[in-house]
Amino acid sequence: TWRDVQHILVETSRKNDGSDSSWTTNGDGHLVSHKYGFGVVDATAAVLLSENWTSVSEELNVSSGMQTVDLDIPDNSGAPVNVSFNVTQALHLENVDIFVDIDHTFRGDLEIILTAPSGMQSVLSEKHEDANNNYADWRFSTVQHWGEDSRGQWTLSIEDQGNNDVGTLNEWGLVLYGTERDIDSDGDMLTDANETNVYFTDPFDADSDDDQLSDGYEVLNSSTDPNNNDSDFDALSDGFEVLVKGTNPLLADTDGDGLDDGTEV
């Protein structure tokens, strides 16, 4: 698909004009430039990557809806007008659309910048010679935040950098596009989705059964039950057996002598 082509080009493009000051690294580690995008296309690298490429997953989106703010934009005050929206859904970002409705008698005076939760900025419009009025139901789009986490506060800043013309930000909104991001809120090596839907553990507690073994360790290494602190019912916790005694937490009588481990200990 065209999205796969985008991904391949982002991953294989090379930095050009390395001395240019517009190059920066975004929140996902991609080199990006407001002049050059992701750089020059490396056709050979792109073809090689495409040969074993796995298609990207379904595109999802998060929308702020249009936010009515009716904020005056001061004339050449040196300070921008800022509006923000907090995104709670986790996407692995591809692109962001920004919608504005601005009344202004000389729109070229306006510098418009979007700042992501990562701190990465997209300059949507710089001061330029454009004597037209208004940004009426206008859409800007940026891929500068490619790969970043969508969660957190997004801020739109609008600054009038010219004299004698004033305006108002009437409405604004965001639509963020990307793929589902695997989240591991408690850092136990299991995604929140798998904890909730597969293992039924607490995605915000790394050790759901309080046996001193993380949920991820129990699922991926010891094969013990992350919701039962004594998987073999021998009166010893799984963590105590693994970390202290070295007994088998899945076998009540590790040494096969007719006495369970708990009785022997």
Task: Give the positions of each predicted feature.
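Sec/Tat-exported extracytoplasmic proteins
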Residues: 9-17, 50-51, 162, 198, ...
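Extracellular calcium-associated, cysteine-rich motifs in secreted modular proteins
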Residues: 181-265
